[in-house]
Amino acid sequence: MKVNQIYVNLPVKDIQKTKEFWTRVGFSINEQFSDDKAVCVVMSDTIYVMFLTEEYFQTFSERPVPKGDTTQVLVAIGLNSREEVDQVVNAAVANGAYQHEEPQDYGWMYQNSFWDINGHGWNVTFADMSQMPQE
């Protein structure tokens, strides 16, 4: 079995600000799946992030929405170059996110990270698997 699409659902307080943030970072919006309760950010042809208002998110889960002082998930995305990694993180920070830690360079893999305007953690990576050390 193989998954053919992934939709990550995350709660947010403000749909419009979230839409503006991710557009400024450089991602497109699937308007067909967006409205005043949700915005669908297109990460790739098969990967989407559905940012849902906290109230709407609650209709899918009986568990409470975290209040911002806890971490339930860190979303990791892979890009095509170190430059793209820094471009995304720098654009996120320029639009209200904050950098989680200094970039990590492992030679074959490069990672940078940020907390978005809603407090969600993002690890942004580039990996050259042909250079991965063999143990």
PLM feature segments, named:
Residues 1-6, 27-82, 86-115, 126-135:
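Vicinal oxygen chelate
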Residues 14-29:
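Amphipathic alpha-helical segments
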Residues 9, 16, 86:
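Conserved catalytic core of two-component sensor histidine kinases
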